[in-house]
Amino acid sequence: MIKTARQLKDLIRNLSKDKSADAQILMRNYMMERFLERISLSEYRDKFILKGGMLVAAMVGLDARSTMDIDATVKGATVGIEEVENMIASIISVPVDDGVEFRLKRISEIMDEAEYPGIRVSMETEFDGVITPLKIDISTDDAITPHEVRYSFKLMLEDRSIEIWAYNLETVLAEKLETVVSRATTNTRMRDFYDLHILSQLHGQSIIPADLRAALIATARKRGTEKYLADAPAAFDEVEADPNMEKLWRAYQKKFSYAADLSWHTVMESIRNLYRLARAE
């Protein structure tokens, strides 16, 4: 068990060198893992379903994807500010012998470019005097197709895993694929494009085409964007040919070394192939 900030910082520093990852991001990931462990031990363990960047990073490795926050959906519960406040308070009060203290700072409704509404939770952790900010975005009633899966989340600094509920691979891909199709050149989140590429490269053999197809249709139906699916090939061509999109991709490559050697065309071809797989009869 890690007992001091010095010990933790040394471990993070060594991992940072090994993974060519930012030490500050790894520190935040460690604290996010501490929160996940509390979830896995709490009364909400069967309601809390991990999705988003933290799940993608776990699936592909921290050397191939970084993330700064937790995205989750809650099953079978109302997601209002009061309900989330009670839920988070209960989760962070779960006793875990790791020396980490969680403090709830702010809870607000998500009003930015969210696909559908949710609640944003801002917290901070303290470990041996070191303060780390955390953010959690929580939604409800997501279209998980065919269903969520039990996921063994491998810890960063320990040789063990946490058992949690998570999106299945096909739903992860479907949500991002729907976003790329429906938003086309208005989607400036290059991580969506990267995630589709890296997941297809590393987990392509695990994709069940029928589930991907069903998940894509269910996601589009949930978001009211079914009409865009048939025109996806044209949308992909428009996105790839758009100078601003390629400029955004180059900026993403400069910011994240794991994307440095990926051409824009290669990424878009991966996305086209995923769409073909999803639409195959």
Indicate where each model-derived feature is located:
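Structured mid-to-C-terminal alpha-helical surface segments
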Residues: 1-48, 57-66, 70-281
